[in-house]
Amino acid sequence: MFTTKKSLLLLFFLGTINLSLCQEERNAEEERRDGDDEGGVEVQKRFFPFLLGALGSLLPKIFGK
């Protein structure tokens, strides 16, 4: 009986550690995915003002003739 309890306790302990490691890995993946989305938004924010500035300088030259 004592060895059975010991075995079950060991299995429970190892299962808990395994579950904890899987959850940490999942959280790390979600953070990486979230980080990519934020980077894409920042690139868009930097790109549009540049595009508007370029169009603002080109349009008067094109239609000014």
From Swiss-Prot:
Subcellular location: Secreted
GO cellular component terms given for this protein: extracellular region
Pfam families given in the database record: FSAP_sig_propep
Tissue-level expression: Expressed by the skin glands.
Signal peptide feature range: 1-22
Keyword line: Amidation, Amphibian defense peptide, Antibiotic, Antimicrobial, Cleavage on pair of basic residues, Cytolysis, Hemolysis, Secreted, Signal
Positions of modified residues (Lysine amide): K65
Propeptide: 23-44
GO biological process entries: defense response to Gram-positive bacterium; hemolysis in another organism
Principal location: secreted
Keyword Secreted applies: yes
Function comment: Antimicrobial peptide. Active against a variety of Gram-positive bacterial strains. Not active against Gram-negative bacteria and against fungi. Shows hemolytic activity against human erythrocytes.
Family that this chain belongs to: Belongs to the frog skin active peptide (FSAP) family. Temporin subfamily.
Protein name: Temporin-SN1
